[in-house]
Regions:
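Catalytic-core elements of nucleic-acid end-processing and repair enzymes
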Residues: 1-189
Length: 189
């Protein structure tokens, strides 16, 4: 019977299922976009693989995972409808990753590890620059994950190398310069 279909009685997932189907339909264009970005930023896929061991961490309710590659980042951005999946504005994140100024990670609910929840932009020492969910927003639900993110930062702090700390110091300076420029340009953050 059609009323027995999961999609009918699991309305909470309706939007997500729709987005997954759209992603499947767009897969070819996403792959082309990923190939284009990988050509332009040839180190990002390798950096993504390096991030796996250092930044991945899970607890009972939440987990932080590193993307496998540029395609995974683009897919995440498209599913959450935010700038990381965008051709134009998303490029700044690949530029930052290429320079090791900041990295993209995914915050997930542990019981739904494949479902996008929040996309994080972090500095090499684990400082969280941005937390974004659907439509480039941050909702009150992120407060529930704040304690987890603090514990995650403590765990990864023990995994960091001197090089990571040096990159983090440089990243902080670049972020401060960017804020000064945004203020000069009267951009509201």
């Amino acid at each position: 019977r059609s009323s027995d279909l999961e999609i009918i009685y699991r309305v909470r997932k309706l939007r997500q299922r729709h987005d997954e189907l759209v992603i499947q339909c767009e897969a070819g264009s996403l792959e082309l976009q990923a190939e284009k970005m990988a050509e332009k930023y040839p180190n990002v896929d390798g950096i993504c693989r390096e991030l796996q061991k250092k930044y991945t961490y899970a607890e009972e309710e939440y987990m932080v995972v590193a993307p496998e590659n540029i395609f995974a980042i683009i897919k995440e951005g498209r599913m959450l409808h935010h700038c990381v999946g965008n051709d134009g504005s998303g490029e700044r994140y690949y530029e930052r990753m290429e320079r090791r100024e900041s990295f993209i990670l995914f915050l997930r609910r542990t019981d739904e590890p494949e479902d996008p929840y929040y996309t994080l932009e972090i500095e090499p020492d684990g400082t969280v620059r941005q937390k974004r969910t659907l439509f480039d927003r941050q909702h009150e639900d992120i407060e529930q994950a704040t304690d987890f993110l603090r514990r995650w930062q403590k765990v990864i702090a023990e995994r960091l190398t001197g090089r990571d700390l040096k990159l983090a110091a440089e990243s902080r300076i670049l972020r401060e310069k960017e804020f000064i420029q945004l203020k000069k340009d009267r951009v509201i953050i």
